[in-house]
Amino acid sequence: MTRRYWNINLEEMMEAGVHFGHGTRKWNPRMAPYISAKRKGIHITNLTRTARFLSEACDLVFDAASRGKQFLIVGTKNKAADSVARAAIKARCHYVNKKWLGGMSTNWSTTETRLHKFRDLRTEQKTGRLNRLPKRDAAMLKRQLSHLQTYLGGIKYMTGLPDIVIIVDQQEEYTALRECITLGIPTICLIDTNCDPDLADISIPANDDAIASIRLILNKLVFAICEGRSSYIRNP
């Protein structure tokens, strides 16, 4: 895997608050190598380590995107949801930003059935068939469609399991992470000072609570994916 320059700037990360961790009482001792200091009761992440692992993650997604691989971005907490959707849409990735439904990947056949139902209902709505049904039936199907749009809208074009999963918050998305580990799907994970750095394939130590921090990390990864996709288009 070729190393590239991704313009990862320590000052920019500081401005985004990437270095702010959790309170010292909430830390995971396994994060010790990634912590540079304690300040006013909170741990401070070593941004040099952040830059190193973010750069490795960018190299990985660039390489994967240049070979036509598919990505899934997962981040369901309120602070991350909008940034996840915007990043995924920009890079033409799949995403889950409302709730990870248990078994979404490990029980893919069930997810696939739901997606087929979702696509059928969308087609019926677009063609006006729903409005020609009795009111009660139409209302029930519209509620189903709304529910499916909320939870599966970001993966509506998925036709199989993703090649790489990017996870915004390890603790919040622990079920998704465990499913990826079970299936052997490579993962890139933002990890705060209360997380386990050994679970994901690439763990990026960073503030997973601040919107600016989440957005900065996602923007770097998305840029690398887009660059990789451009390379794939030029050299299919």
Curated annotation (Swiss-Prot):
Gene Ontology terms: biological process: translation
Top-level lineage group: Eukaryota
Record carries keyword DNA damage: no
Protein's UniProt keywords contain Transmembrane helix: no
GO cellular component labels: chloroplast; mitochondrial small ribosomal subunit
InterPro entries: Ribosomal_uS2, Ribosomal_uS2_bac/mit/plastid, Ribosomal_uS2_CS, Ribosomal_uS2_flav_dom_sf
GO MF term list: structural constituent of ribosome
Compartment(s): Plastid, Chloroplast
Xref: Pfam families: Ribosomal_S2
Keywords assigned: Chloroplast, Plastid, Ribonucleoprotein, Ribosomal protein
PANTHER family the record matches: 30S RIBOSOMAL PROTEIN S2 PROKARYOTIC AND ORGANELLAR (PTHR12534), SMALL RIBOSOMAL SUBUNIT PROTEIN US2M (PTHR12534:SF0)
Protein family according to the UniProt entry: Belongs to the universal ribosomal protein uS2 family.
Protein name: Small ribosomal subunit protein uS2c
Organism (species): Vitis vinifera
